[in-house]
Amino acid sequence: MESFIIEGGHMLSGTITPQGAKNEALEVICATLLTNEEVRIKNIPDILDVNNLILLLKDIGVEVNRVGKNEYTFCSKNIDLGYLDGEEFVRKCASLRGSVLMIGPLLARFGKAVVAKPGGDKIGRRRLDTHFLGFKKLGAKFVHSEGTNTFEIKANRLKGTYMLLDEASVTGTANIIMAA
């Protein structure tokens, strides 16, 4: 067994800035889809999943500018909803599990979202059922396309309701709250 020996009496000084957390960054970045105003986010981690989500948002028309180290502005004024139906969007969504977090904001603002069965990291049991059941309880309708293995999710008007999720899911909860 390994151990650390800590000797006291030595004054520490200085500052550190911890890297932003991936899952929180994915949620906050997707939340920028809820408004057409510019949003500035600091401490965005420079990691593959976050960078791929930023590229995906650019593809759908979000204006993204890097304004400093780990700091970006996002403006979702000109979203191209037609891009959601294209093969390129579906392919990119399938390789990025975090893309599922776009559903809530897109449903809330535009009444439409498309999602491919996402990939990404494979840690444990990572179902999307919690997200989908929550959206259905808010009034969204799902249509599965066998050919593209995608779901088109539509809602003319989402309506808040009491909800007890079938499993604990931080991203599911965040996604449902963004839709509500």
Model-predicted segments: where are they?
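Structural preference for solvent-exposed beta-strand-turn elements
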Residues: 1-180
